[in-house]
């Protein structure tokens, strides 16, 4: 009888001893910050008892901390890695019952000589749920590509991003305005048309991040995905660098100036340990000469200036204030000059951009982080003809003076706040995040248009009169633009979100979020749920699978809503004998916002990551995006001409299979290869406007940037040592893809067949450069020389698509082989 009470007491003692033992087990708290005492989230921390032991692993949260628990007191090796930073190794870490370790990670700087630092290698990140691609600032500097002064050209070498013939990027087949472009966390997308117009010096970028699926609920207003531009800031060391400060020359129609495109960066402390600055200035002057044009009409002058100024101050150990101001100015004397568009038919184009933002980050004593910020963007574009001569278009060329004068202004005021809560424990670890975003957008425009005469094959423009006064008329079509007026549009956008990162185990992570959007145009409450997960299949962390599905909505595009105020078009059509066919056709546009609903996209994807032998990292992804109720202009009866009404009848479809292989070597050497098979199509692909002369009904087809098969590769590799020169670096980039589609029209600009029925030839370009880094005069330098399109393949960017022209399918605008050089002054060590 006494055995049972004794057994009961023993069990109670054992039960009480378990939590006591757990509490006595050692804990290690690791805090990661950068050179400016800013918390570094998503850094991987490895704790290893011996080289043979399997390392323990944790990832820092928003506060830059992570904790190891249930670890015996001993001597360990601690390793910290994060993309964009140098990895850090602490060979001996000793701790007892509790220990705190503060670690400072340094951002990757341009390598000037062999130093005892190693770039963080690519790893399979168990906490990265989104489908994300990233290139670092050093990648942008090292990758050779045409016009390296423009970071937008480097975007073409990010898997999933395609650059169209106008230089605009498209994320996973989406339109440019369907991407959310952030500069250091603030929205800099052009408020009216959504184009990527802001220019930042390539030397100012720390990284460019692209997320196209499984996005956090924090990011909305863009069905295509997120394009994040992250710039640098100074530290406690003064740094100065400059690139291309020596003009280049060209031997084209004689020996002439080619261009001057210097870039300067200066950074350092205002008060060491407390306040820092960063300034990146760049400019260019291009003397563009066209060999195929006659002397005296073959020259275009383009100039541009830009400057990014930033400042950061740590008000206290818990308060960080940052601010920046970006200015851009661009001027082109003969915008669009080409063989088909002579000087007198080109406009003078001037563009400007002013972007500023401020953000404060405050850590509360309870572990919460609050971010509040304000941003302002202002874009302006002016296009002016060179005179008042009548403008005409023939099957082979244009003439007269450009018909269009425009003056547009677009603005956005943005206020945002994000609240991060400390991790909570419930069946795993939860990291909750909440936020709001309020934007006010404005757009105003002034347009003036002159008539356009469309000439028949073999006809010349009449020296006097117009297409309507000549009998027989030399024209196939004549367009005039009555009813032009000034345009003003505005909108207010309100957004809020809630996000939970649920770490169920060290290998299983689920992200669930809900986003709310509302604006003054659609005036509907929009709820966008998101769900994604990632699972690491092995203890070594070498295999991972991720999947997710989510709803996204586009912001209301003001350029479409402003189209009714842009005026109307009156089209006269002529028979082959020069006589008028029927009464003129009136083309006008209308938009009833009360009948509109927000376009809705379903985005789903799955990715598989695997570390292969020889340290090759492979990623395979499948992505599907389906958009319904997308804005499009169409006539009510689906016939050419008439009143075009803004409707929700467009459906977009995009699917893609992607395979990426990446291998990093010592220092910053590495190679990337990416293949994508995709299709980007719509049931109503045409974009009608008063300035679009295409005359047809809506029709299905591929988008103009659709490229079903695409292979890109780039890398930086050590080259052979050459006599008297020493070791060299070999940089390359390559792209091979299916040619873009184009429409076929007749001499009246009526669509022949379906949109995108024909394609440009297959595209291939290989850029190959050699670079030498050396020390001279007490400073570090880097000189690069090489060829863009070294194979000399003729890749056209324009085509005669008039089926009635003898030059139908004549391609032009070839980019031939080009020898380029670059010199960089890197300062002192």
Task: Give the residues covered by each predicted segment.
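Transmembrane beta-barrel wall of Gram-negative outer-membrane proteins
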Residues: 256-332, 348-372, 529
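Periplasm-facing N-terminal accessory domains of Gram-negative outer-membrane beta-barrel systems
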Residues: 20-136, 187-189
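Transmembrane beta-barrel strands of outer-membrane/channel proteins
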Residues: 119, 240-248, 279-283, 323-329, ...
